[in-house]
Structure formats: C-alpha cells, structure tokens
A protein has these predicted regions:
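Conserved donor-nucleotide/metal-binding helix-loop-beta segment in metal-dependent transferases, i.e.
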Residues: 74-109
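A short acidic, amphipathic alpha-helical/loop segment
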Residues: 16-18, 56-59, 77-82
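Residues that flank catalytic or metal-binding motifs in active/ligand-binding sites
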Residues: 23, 68, 135-136
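Catalytic core and acceptor-binding pocket of nucleotide-sugar-dependent glycosyltransferases
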Residues: 113-200
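A residue-level signal for conserved active-site and pocket-lining positions in enzyme catalytic cores
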Residues: 4, 27, 57, 71, ...
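Short beta-strand-to-loop acidic/aromatic patch adjacent to the donor-nucleotide binding site
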Residues: 62-73
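N-terminal anchoring/stem segment of glycosyltransferases
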Residues: 1-50, 59-64, 162-166, 177-180, ...
C-alpha cells in the first residue's frame, strides 16, 4: 500500500478530497485538530508541519510515499503519476526561480527572514560546491524503503532545524550531499495531477 499524506495545522489550509481516489493508496492528514474529510484518515499531532513533511514517520509509512501541501487538491490518478515520474525522490521544478541564490533573496524579501542568517547558510552550500536546480517542495514523491532517501531526509531535517527554517533552501543540498539528483517534474506534469490553491 502506498501513502499520500498532507499536513494542516493552525487552520492554515482547507483539506480537499481528491477528485480521483487511486487504487492501492491510503490518504492521511496530520493536523493539530481532528478533520473529517473522507477518504483522508486523520492523525492528530502536535508536531511541527515541516518536521512531518521532511521526516515522515517510518513506523507509519514505507514503500512509495507522496507528500502534498495542504493547499493542493489531487485531481489525477496517482498510479499514473508514479508511472510517469521516477519515484526514488522527485519534486516539482520551481516555476519562478532557478537556484538557491534567487530563493534566498525571495525568502529574505517575502518571508522576512534574516539576511545574515540566510546568507550564512547559502555561502556554506556554495563554498561546498553545490549548484543544482531549485525545487518547489509542495509535492514530494519518495521511496522510503531506500536507505539513501532516509539519510537525505535526516540531513534535510537537520539543515532545516539548524538554519533559517526554509525547507526549500536545504532540500537540493541535502540530496546533493548524498549524490542523489532528484527528478524535478515541470508544471505541465504538475497541472495534470494537482491543483494549487492560495492558502486559506
């Protein structure tokens, strides 16, 4: 059984039922309060949403796992999606920015992050030799049976926890450190299976 999951806390988003319920998938929402939207099963938790996004619970999940942001509606068949997209580790190519320097400027300008803190993180990545395309981590397709994927998640979690707190900045670096190039699908593929809404 594969798992699709999302995280909604603080009333930040409205959970949307998938337009198509895909055979062989279970749907799980983590939230700080109970949400009743079938076919989603709800697990009430006090964990931070980014922690659940980055480090899915190995006791609950194995095999193929799909994370979607709470602002996303699933509109396509997930079995077709995993046939189209390599499932070791995949995410969406960022539609507006191409690299972490552009993302750094965006989180400073739009999210109010500390410039010195962000640039300290970015400089460390660039000095290490990192220069990979930018992902938009609103969708994450992972094979959690893969030990390299689990190690990447652990490093990504550590980078998120000990830096400026913007997970997209450290995703690509964490994959690169373990020699894994994530598959980044484009907006044509994204729009075939998902619909993005503004945060409620």
């Amino acid at each position: 059984m594969n798992t699709c999951y999302t995280v909604i806390t603080g009333g930040y988003d409205t959970l949307k039922p998938p337009r198509i319920i895909s055979e062989g998938w279970e749907y799980t929402v983590f939230s700080d309060k109970f949400i009743d939207v079938p076919p989603w099963g709800c697990i009430v938790t006090d964990k931070h949403n980014r922690e659940l996004k980055i480090m899915p619970n190995a006791e609950l999940f194995n095999n193929i796992t799909l994370y979607v942001d709470g602002s996303i509606e699933i509109i396509g068949n997930l079995n077709k999606f995993v046939k189209e997209v390599p499932n070791r580790y995949a995410s969406c190519k960022h539609p507006h920015r191409t690299n972490i320097m552009q993302e750094a400027e965006a989180v400073i300008r739009l999210k109010g992050c500390s410039r010195p803190l962000v640039m300290q993180q970015i400089d460390r990545y660039i000095d290490a030799g990192f220069d990979e395309p930018l992902a938009e981590c609103c969708v994450l397709l992972r094979n959690l049976n893969d030990p390299v994927v689990r190690r990447i998640n652990k490093l990504w979690h550590s980078e998120w926890l000990n830096s400026c707190g913007r997970d997209q900045l450290s995703f690509g670096y964490s994959c690169w450190k373990y020699g894994l190039k994530p598959y980044l699908f484009d907006q044509v593929v994204f729009k075939r299976y998902f619909k993005l809404y503004s945060h409620s």
